[in-house]
Regions:
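A short acidic, Gly/Pro-enriched loop at the edge of an enzyme's catalytic core
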Residues: 99-110
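A short SAM/SAH-binding and catalytic strip from SAM-dependent methyltransferases
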Residues: 109-122
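A short glycine-rich, Lys/Arg-flanked "PGG" loop and its adjoining helix->strand segment in the class I
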Residues: 124-139
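Conserved class I S-adenosyl-L-methionine
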Residues: 1-40, 54-58, 75-78, 85-86, 141-166, ...
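Conserved Class I S-adenosyl-L-methionine
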Residues: 52, 186-252
Length: 252
């Protein structure tokens, strides 16, 4: 046994694939997040569950320094390579837990997490941790898959079938409620939709495996109402659907 949990195991194997993901590197949600955060040249940023570092490097040109933390060493290795190859000097990457960072109170001006919170064991605990390390009036920036009300059970089902480390994706209203309970005030909230083909959604999992079979079976059993809500192109088999992500910025 290597002692790794489901998240480390999944992303350790697929780190290289995420480095090549155009959606992660250039998704509309990333530009929306950076714009909504309004980063300043003197600010320090903590990017939680940084993965291969796309969010950290997108923010780096606008701030003093970005620290990216992640539980998966292989993802951090990819992030360091991308930063080096891109000449991004004001970023650093280290192992760290989203729900229990080592940083002191009031350390950061901005805390971000993008496309990762659905892997967190305890999202409210992460939000409390973000609140702790943020300075007064600091901003929290979140991007995560966020299914429409009424589709969350199905969306979480297929995400878990694709990736066993997926825990839960929350609706926009659930996110706003959790953020408020942690002490933040939401300043910006927008849902960004991306029409994804089955193949693009499954990536970096390869076609033809047990994951594809299980997910296609789930789609066949899905309610027609769910397919309509997700804007699914469905004729005998699902071809594409709209994957929704919330972009949320809140202030301490």
């Amino acid at each position: 046994m290597d002692g790794k949990g489901p998240t480390e195991s999944f992303f350790g194997v697929h780190a290289g694939g995420y480095t090549k993901s155009q959606s992660h590197a250039h998704g509309e949600d990333l530009a929306t997040l950076v714009d909504a955060l309004k980063p300043k040249p003197t600010e320090l940023v903590l990017d939680v569950a940084t993965g291969t570092g796309f969010t950290a490097m997108a923010l780096a040109p606008y701030v003093s320094h970005v620290t990216g933390i992640d539980v998966t060493a292989e993802m951090l290795d990819e992030a360091r390579k991308l930063a080096h190859n891109g000449g991004v000097l004001n970023v650093s990457f280290e192992l760290g837990d989203a729900q229990a960072t080592k940083f002191a109170d009031w350390t950061y001006d901005i805390v971000t997490t993008r496309r990762a919170a659905h892997h967190f064991q305890d999202v409210p605990r992460f939000l409390r941790e973000a609140y702790r390390v943020l300075r007064p009036k600091g901003r929290l920036g979140i991007v995560d898959m966020s299914p429409p009300e009424g589709t969350e059970a199905f969306c979480n089902q297929i995400e878990r079938l694709r990736d066993g480390s997926h825990i839960e994706a929350f609706t926009p209203n659930a996110w706003k409620s959790m953020v408020a309970e942690a002490g933040f005030q939401t300043q910006f909230s927008e849902v960004v939709g991306e029409q994804v083909t089955f193949e693009r959604w499954l990536y970096p999992i390869e076609l033809g495996g047990k994951e594809e079979v299980a997910v296609r079976t789930a789609w066949r059993s899905a309610r027609q109402e769910t397919r309509l809500q997700l804007n699914a192109d469905y004729s005998n088999e699902v071809k594409s659907w709209t994957k929704s992500r919330i972009v949320l910025v809140a202030v301490k």
